[in-house]
Amino acid sequence: VVQQITTTSSTTTIQSILQKQYPINCSSSSSYNNGDGWSCENLYDGDPSSWQDNSLQCQDGWVEFSFSQELYIEFLVFQNVEDSKSFSRNFKARDILITTTDSEFLLNKELENDNTSQWIDINATTSYLKIDILSADPGEEVSGSQPFEECAIQEITFYGRG
């Protein structure tokens, strides 16, 4: 999806194209194995690796992202673990709260308990975004394998202009 907006001012024409926006860094409430292989950087690396909390079942979990400058985030795509066995066995975020540098911006969202991409409209200008996990769907036993205690998110992709 590519959209183009042209804004004309008295002296210049500015084009802003909707595109993927990448954080310059992130932090999280915790990471499994001290982040070795499971850190929040996995959330925007474009591959199937995931962020996992430190066996806390999503309780009091959060991830936050910083961008190099203020930008307009139109939406984000939230991706639970795609692999069906891992998806079933891990805890998954259900209710989330999204906040930004704007103290007036609060977005509550209930996520679906599935492993498909979920689009969340943001429509805010910010250099920082935080996702608090308010509740979770538990992991389940799969073919005799016990559920995991970790909260897992595979990818969060930001789309915006800036």
Residue ranges and their predicted role:
Residues 32-106, 114-162:
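Aromatic, loop-rich ligand-recognition surfaces of beta-strand-rich domains
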Residues 4-5, 16, 53, 162:
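Positively charged, low-complexity intrinsically disordered regions
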Residues 1-13:
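Extracellular mucin-like PTS domains
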